[in-house]
UniProtKB/Swiss-Prot annotation:
Enzyme class, first EC level, given as a word: oxidoreductase
Cofactor: FMN
Tagged with keyword DNA-binding: no
Catalytic residue positions: H275
Residue positions binding substrate: Y24, Y129, R164, R278
Lineage: Bacteria, Pseudomonadati, Pseudomonadota, Gammaproteobacteria, Pseudomonadales
Record carries keyword Flavoprotein: yes
GO molecular function, one term: FMN binding
Species the sequence originates in: Pseudomonas fluorescens (strain SBW25)
Residue positions binding FMN: 106, 127, 155, 251, 306-330
Name of this protein: L-lactate dehydrogenase
Amino acid sequence: MIISSASDYRAAAQRKLPRFLFDYIDGGAYAEHTMRANSSDLAEISLRQRILRNVDNLSLKTTVFGQELDMPVILSPVGLTGMYARRGEVQAAKAAANKGVPFCLSTVSVCPIEEVASQSARAIWFQLYVLKDRGFMRNALERAQAAGVTTLVFTVDMPTPGARYRDAHSGMSGPFAAQRRMLQAMTKPQWAFDVGLMGRPHDLGNISKYLGKPTHLEDYIGWLANNFDPSISWKDLEWIREFWKGPMIIKGILDPQDAKDAVSFGADGIVVSNHGGRQLDGVLSTAKALPPIADAVGDDLTVLVDSGIRSGLDVVRMLALGAKACLLGRASAYALAADGQNGVENLLDIFAKEMRVAMTLTGVTSIEQIDHTTLVGQRQ
């Protein structure tokens, strides 16, 4: 199969993965309107082409929280990554390090913090949910700190799980889910051997180490469902801000006032995110939410963005809308599922090439030069 874009990796991942896993990556909440809008709204943003400008010395490098990045991209935290490829979190972290960008490990990863951090040539980031079990949160923070994690990403848009209808149909949840997953795995023998058999253990590494016992998919669903905390407020996070001395990012911001509250709280950065359209259907796409948020707080903290980003062209669009860098979730998960570490490295090469073309044809030579003037009819 010819691979030239993230959409090609999506098709390859769909062929390789059992349906329940592919739909878990690919699906969103409710009827998935917001999930689709994330990509479609971004695609409608027009860049301003410029000609006869010297763009010979072009660079994708940038700096985020004092860390130099070879391009303004971070691999986003994605749950169960170790089920898409054998020890998938390790492979993704290695790919990111080789390409000079950060990798962020999910709370609900298969591989534990210690395994991933020890095998990455670059310090990793760690994502943490706000959960009722504060003991787990403290344990995870202490382990992350001991493993050399540099940056903490706090996901705050999950006080309750989103209604993901596709998961019920695919076997991730719903009646006879375990039996349906087993039958699906039997139809994908390559995945069943490489990941299902050779990728063991399939524990949720960060959780099982805390609980002191193996944790499997049903444990993941049940434990998380019982631990989401709808009572959480900014005040409940104060102890974490005091404990964590490195950069702390609040992920899940869609409203300018919430962004201002993050500044008051003392966050170093935010991620403008609707969780890839996986939480509340009907909210703004991140392409539409980003500009007013960047205008409100862009001078006070680092603004990052995710959701709907499928190309280097999309990265340039998001930077022009006000982001400092972009997080890649689904795109990197597709590439990992399709071809492991090599797939992720190739995807990042594709993004870099697409960015270079976009920058060349819009007449900019550095990431810092990309701003609202790079766009037609947006934020001018």
